[in-house]
Every structure is written in structure tokens, then in C-alpha cells.
Curated annotation (Swiss-Prot):
It is found in: Cell inner membrane. One of its GO terms (molecular function) is metal ion binding. NCBIfam families: crcB. It comes from Magnetococcus marinus (strain ATCC BAA-1437 / JCM 17883 / MC-1). This is Fluoride-specific ion channel FluC. GO terms for biological process: cellular detoxification of fluoride.
């Protein structure tokens, strides 16, 4: 049954990623992978927040954890798209944007997860 919960969360997370990243691209354009960066930042923050709340503060059903954390946020965030977009920037000769994407994605997503944990502690 747990696999079904992960699959349901994955379906919801994938659709949410598609909608949000396309909205960001429509707003900011596609010269830089803003859509992927935005979903990864938001997903990292939510992952840190909910991980802390689920393990330290809230009594949630066990089925909810894999549904939200593994399925939902796992499908919402995307390392493979980040990798492909970075390679595309490199192949087009935009090395500075590729480096910016690598550094900002890794550093800011780890910072976002940490901030999520901090906010969870404050709630």
C-alpha cells in the first residue's frame, strides 16, 4: 500500500512542478533555468520544514510521510532536469550561466532546506 501512496504523491508533485515551472518560465523567460531553480528551491524549503515537523512536532499517519516527502516532493523537485539544463547551457557556450546554475542550485537549495528546518523549529 505504501507504494500506492508514493505513486499518488508523485503524480501530484509532478503536475505541481509542471504548472509552477511553466508559470515561472512564462514570467521570467527561458534564458536561464528559472523554472527548475524555483521548484527546487521551494521543494527544498518544504522538505526541510515538513521533515522537521513530521519527525519532531506533528503526529501524522505513517502513510502521509512517503506520500508527501518521497512521492510529492521527490517528483516536485528535479535533479535530472537541472542536470540537462546545465548541459544545454554548456553546449550553447553559456558557461557563466551554467556555472551560475550549478552554484545557485546546490547552495541555495541546501540553504532553503536548512531554512525550512529553522522555520519548523520556530512553529
Amino acid at each position: 500500500m505504501q507504494i500506492a501512496w508514493v505513486a499518488l504523491g508523485g503524480a501530484i508533485g509532478a503536475v505541481a512542478r509542471y504548472v509552477l515551472s511553466n508559470a515561472v518560465y512564462a514570467w521570467l523567460g527561458r534564458a536561464f533555468p528559472w523554472g527548475t531553480l524555483s521548484v527546487n528551491l521551494l521543494g527544498s524549503f518544504i522538505m526541510g520544514l515538513l521533515f522537521y515537523l513530521f519527525t519532531q512536532r506533528l503526529m501524522v499517519p505513517e502513510a502521509l510521510k512517503p506520500l508527501v516527502l518521497v512521492g510529492g516532493l521527490g517528483a516536485f523537485t528535479t535533479f535530472s532536469t537541472f542536470s540537462l539544463e546545465t548541459l544545454n547551457l554548456m553546449q550553447s557556450g553559456s558557461w557563466s550561466l551554467a556555472l551560475l546554475n550549478m552554484l545557485s542550485s546546490v547552495l541555495l537549495c541546501v540553504l532553503a532546506a536548512y531554512l525550512g528546518l529553522v522555520v519548523g523549529r520556530l512553529i
